Amino acid sequence: MQAYAREHGIAVHLDGARLWNAHVASGTPLRELAAGFDTVSVCLSKGLGAPVGSVLVGSREHVAAARVWRKRYGAGMRQTGFLAAAGRYAVRHHVDRLAEDHANARVLAAALDVDPATVDTNIVFAEVADPGAFVAGAAERGVRVMQLGPRAVRLVTHLDVSAEDAARAAEVLAALPR
């Protein structure tokens, strides 16, 4: 797709909502992960724990054009310094700790008989016979799980899930019928 876009003068954008996780899990520098894209957006709330926000990275021209479109769509905000400060803090202090989320996800994976080696970041996909019953059973015991389809569930660890929380959730999940 990138080659086609380049041939036709089309800019290529990377939705980097989980780019921080990919960076920490793979050890690949962010610059390398974003190579070949004209713009990249990175989320400051998913994983990093900022209250809101994303950052758009690109050339001055691309970012200026994005600001124009943001204004046209009425998406501008005023007095956002405190939110910017929270985002800056998250980038400075929460990127490296994403490895903890990844380790917690592997704990959940093991409880569900999912090979932990297949869990690269903070998201676990598992196959269960009755996802609706599984989700309900987990919820009754204080563990939130998302149904993905007729035989699949998804679990996500994050800044607010400690190693102790993951261990407790793993006990709950392991006891549920799958």
Residue ranges and their predicted role:
Residues 1-128, 132-141, 145-161, 165-177:
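Conserved PLP-enzyme active-site core in the AAT-like
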